[in-house]
Each structure stands twice: as C-alpha cells, then as structure tokens.
Amino acid sequence: MSTGAPRRLGVRHHKLRAPRKHGLSVSVEEMWSRLSAAIAQIQHHNISKLSYEEHYRYAYNLILNQQGDMLYQGVQLQIQEHLVNQSDMRLTPVFSLSIEEAQAASQAMSGSDKGKLRDNTARLLGLLPGNAEALFPTIPAGERFLSAVTAMWDDHCSCMSKIRDVLKYVDRVYVPNHRREPIWDLGLDLFRDTVVRSTRVPCRTNLLVAMLRQVYCEREGATVERRTIKAVTDMLLSLLHDAKQSVYTHDFEPIFLSTTSEYYATEATRLLESQRATYYLQSAERRFAEEQARVDACLSPNTLAPLKEIVERRLLTEHLDEILAMPDGGLVVLLDTDARADMERMYRLFRLVPTGLDALNKVLRAYVTDRGKIINETTLCESKNTQTPSAEMAMSWVNQVLNTKSRLDGVLATSFQGDKSCEAAINEAMDTFINLNTRAPEFISLYIDEHLRKGTRFADDTTALEPVLDKTITIFRYVHEKDVFERYYKMHLTRRLLHNRSASDDAERSMIAKLKVECGHGYVQKLQGMLNDMKLSEEVLRAFHHTLEREGTSLPLQLNVNVLTATYWPIASPKEPSIFPPALTEACNAFEKFYDTRHRGRVLTWQPSLGTADVRVQFKSRTHELVVSTYALMVL
C-alpha cells in the first residue's frame, strides 16, 4: 500500500457473490460480534480463514434490519481503539522528544494555526544556522520515529482497504442515505484525530519537530533519509484538515516556511559578513538548488513556489544593494576586471527577484557614466595642453569610447544574455557621458576624417575601414547635436575633396549612406551634392582641356577647376575682388568662356581662399617645388 494513499483510492476488489435471500439465522448481536471479530482479525493481519462473502452478508443484513447506526458507530469505535493501542505500542516508545521538550516545542509552535506564526520559532526550536552540532545527534531518533509513523500509516491503509471491501454495502446504501463519511474516509479521519493530532500524547509535536529537524540537519550538511520524509509528506497530504486543506498544508507547511524564513535571514547575515559577493552568490545559488531538489524529492510540489519566494527574498531581495556594493566581487569590481562568469551568475540570480534587475541596472548605469566622465576629463586635460593636436585628442577620445562600448557589448551579450533592460541602462549612460563632452560632434567628425583622408594608415587598409565606420556610427547615434556634427563633417569633407585628400569616392559615399540611414535623406542631401559637384567638375575639366587641344589653344599654366554649388558647400563669398597675376587671369578667363558655352547664364565666382598652387622656384643652383595657397601665389 502506498504511503500517500489518497481518499477513495482505487484498490483491487474481491469478487463477492450476492447474498442469498433468507431470514436471519443469527441475531443482530451475534452478527455484529462476528463482524467485529473479523475486523479485528483484519487489523491483526490474520485473514487467511476469513470469508469475505459471509461477513459482507452480516453487514448487508444489519443494514436491512435498520442497524446501520449501530454498525457504523461500532466500526468507528473499533478502529479508533485499535489506533490508540497501536499508537501506544509503536509510537510512544520512540518519541524523539522528552515530555519537557515536547511541551516547549509545542509552545514555540503555538499560534501556527491560520498561518499566524511566531517570528522566532526557528530560534526557539534551535533551527538557526550554527546549531548543527546540537541537532545532528537527533537524526537517528527522528528517523526511527518518522519510520514508525509511516509504518503504522501503511498498516492502517492496508487494513482500511480490506475493511472497506467487507463493508461495501455500507458505503453503497447507508453512507449516502445518512450523510456519513465513506468507510475509507472515516479511517483517514480517525488516523488524523487519533494518531497525528492525538490529544492524549504529543504525537503531532514530535512529528513536526522531527520533520523540521531532519530538514534542518540536511541544510547544515548532514545526510538524512529522504524517503522517510517523502512518506510522511504523502501521509499528511492524504489526511484532510477540511474540504480545502490537507494536514500537510495546514499543520506542516506554515511552520516549515516560517522556520525556513528565519533560517535564511540568519544565513544571509552570516554570508554578508564575508564581504565577498561572488562567494555570497555562489552560496545563494547552491541553496536555491538544494531547496529545489528537496522539494522534488520529499515535499509537496505546491510548497516550491512559497519556499522559493522566501529563500529568494531573504538571500537576495533584502540585500541587493549590499551585494552589488561589496568591495570583493561587487558589480563595479566585476566590470573593471571583466569577470564575465561571475557577472553572469549575478545577472541570473538577480533576475529571479522583482527588483533585482532594477538594482543591477542602477549600478551598471552609474558605472558606465562614471567611466565615461573619466574619459571626458582625461581629454579635457589634454585639450588644455596646446601641444596636443585636436585630431590626436579626437582619436584618443573616440577610441576610448569605442573600447568601452565594445567591452560593454561583450558583457551584455555573454553575462547579461542580451537583456533589454541592461542594454537600455548601458545606452542611457553612454548617451549621458558622450553628450557631456561638448566637443563630441567635432571629435567624431575628426575621427572619421582621419580614417577617410588619403595617405593615412587607416585609409590604406580598405578591408578594415568599413568596420571602423560602422563602429563610429554606433557612437554617432548617441550625439544629440547632430547639426553641429554636420557642420564639422561638411568642413572636413570640404578639405578632403578640395585638397584631393579623400581616400576614395566609394569610402566617402559609404559613410554618407550610413549617415542617411541614421538621419534621413535631408540630413545628407548637401553632402551628396558635394560629392556630385566633384564628379561633375572632373567631367567639365576634361571637356575644357579637350576643347583647348581641339582649338590648338595653350594656357600659360595648367589650370584645374572645381565648380561648386554654393548652397552645398560651407563657403562664404569673397568680400573684395582679388587681383590675379596675368597668367592666372588669362587661364581663368578661358575657363569662364568655355563654361559659359555649356551653361549659359550661370555666374562663376572665384574662391581664391580655397585654391592651391604648385609653384616651381629657382634659387641659385637649386629648384624647389612649393604648394601654396592662391593668395600666396598672388604675393609671389
């Protein structure tokens, strides 16, 4: 018979023939006497010579002769007396508590009805961490008592199954007509009231304390017999307190959860004293697994949810900020040392509790902001040193920001499992410190300029250029003043294009395409126009030289002209006209005449401030080639 026998448990029934219809051959008193003797034989496991048909007929005839009350009450009293005798013989001798201990334990657990529990029950019962040496010796006695209870329970269930078969007619006719409990349910209630909740002996107190001590000792590292605990659990689940609750949920579970809460409150205090977050979380993780395994092995599955909430609240929820701020293994330390496995454990555990990720993200956000401010302050100190070029500062600042972003992205992906709330915290902090640097738009533009300028080590490596531009865009997204960035970018692009320093047209267009994705067509319209002007200028210049060759005209110098659309370029009109040297004037006039034939009505305005000239100068025996501005050419 299973120890966790539920009510109305399906059992194998003996085949019974219908009783023969005949008059009473024996008196009512004799029938009851024989039936009572048969029940006694069943209770003593001496059934080899019993006739189920005969005794079924006795019960049948007693019901027909209106003796159902006498029969039902007699069976109830006989079962009760048997349970009292069995309890005195089998349980009382193996009580694990003395009379004084039982009285003290009962007082400690008083008030447990309806969930109203003392907040110091575990302390009164000696069930707090550190008391293992005192309770480990009680394990064998507790095991003997619990085993005796389950053995008596198994014996009772076996007897009740056979008694129910004999009294099947009682269940079929008498019970529903008189609103009595079925024989099986009667037996369970009698076991509950006569044994488990006996008012004669402190069986309930011994049972609860033994169960609690076994669990406590296992928590402290001892090995206990889980099968026995499981058997007691099944028994208590089979016994009903009322229509909604079992004895397990009414008597055992509240006191178990209450003492568990006290235990882990004390355990958390002990672990916090170590000031080692990694050790704390490893211990918490181990405790969670132990409690899960214990429920799976020997407690009710319904206990898991409230138990889990208690352990998580005591070990995590109530100490989130303390764990995060620990000097050894706190989140800041883990981030600084890039301890991703430990951060993954922290994230995984903090995610279990409602406010865990909020607390973690608060520290994460502050960490990223603080590290970003350090980057900004370092750059600010460099900017005060006039010997540090802006481009060098920009490269340093953007590289540090990119390195920080890359490291945090790695932490987000591996340790925080791509959690959206963690990602939002990182992005918010990045946004904050990047925009605290008022030169961020300029630095990002300079960084891009350094990679797109011809002759730099970055522009020469075309395979590595695209990933760099992609990473730069991730920083650009955080910039609030994108109009400021556009102004700097146009200025740097102008220099690259007009001074023939752009690495390639494809690279320029790729970068502008990325900006278009981020900010839309209107944002890059003028930038695209600048590139188109340069392409059209090449075509116009080729046509100009071809015309000169065809006409056999030669110029006093080689002239290269870029025709720019004024609205696209960051160019101011010259305030005063410039006086070019005669040779330059002749070349300019020739170009204007040619351009007018192709674009009649358009007016060209020369911008000497943007031009350069290659000049060969003879100094005695040495010749020098100079690259000078147009204004310098005019002076020379």
Language-model features, listed with the residues they occupy:
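Eukaryotic scaffold/interaction segments
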Residues: M1-L636
